[in-house]
Amino acid sequence: MRHFLFMLILTAGCAAGQGLTDVSYLRADSIARLYPGHSLIQMKALADKLTTPLPTEIEKFRAIYMWVCLNIETDYDLYVKVKSKRTRHRNDPVALSYWSKKHRALLIHTLLNNNKTICTGYSYLIRELALMANINCHVVDGYSRNTRIGIRSAIIPNHSWNAVRINNQWYLCDATWSSGIIDNSSEKFIPRYNDAWFLADPKVFVRDHFPSDTIWLLTDQHPSLDEFLGRL
């Protein structure tokens, strides 16, 4: 069964990133901007407002993605706390996993009430809004690497993003990275939308993202995990 699922996703994934050049997101983006600061307590109402006026799956998902990127901020204090815990428990994944589960309630509360979160919150919010619009969306846990993350020493996943199925094809996206950047010098999150992580080409995406479940690579051209982590 798993082999069948792998082949199904891989076949669809090979086409991901193709056929999107003629899609206009102007209407979806304008709708996303109509609801700044909309309460997440009324999440279904938000999903309906963002997607009902739009005719296609890709436009509906674009409106959801853009709204999240424009209205949700990375919580700097939470980001630092999680980073510190990862460092402290870098050799004890069981302890870190226990802390993460215990801390999840605070993460959800912060997201719903303050519109702030970290990667886990971004990816779960994208998924929930998409599912409310009848769009198949999956949270992908795995490893990421950038200038802020010491990836070589990673022993458990350190990031989350999404896979979304649109028109029977799977695509990858990372709303955390699309929404802005962390400026450590000022200890602030700087909103700065980056479209590069929206429905990205899997061959490009894998340069910075490696899923725990390799089904979600969506490409057969990729490094091994050890190569990705720089251990080889």
Residue ranges and their predicted role:
Residues F6, P53, I151-S153:
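Residues embedded in well-ordered secondary-structure elements
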Residues G13, G17, R148-G150:
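A generic structural signal for short coil/turn motifs at secondary-structure boundaries
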Residues G19-T117:
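Secondary-structure boundary elements
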Residues D183-L232:
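Alpha-helical and coiled-coil interaction segments, frequently adjacent to or embedded
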Residues G121-K203:
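Hydrophobic/aromatic-rich core segments of domains that either
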Residues A12, V68, I72-Y76, A133-C137, ...:
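A generic secondary-structure signal for well-formed alpha-helical elements
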Residues H3-G13:
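Sec-dependent N-terminal signal peptides
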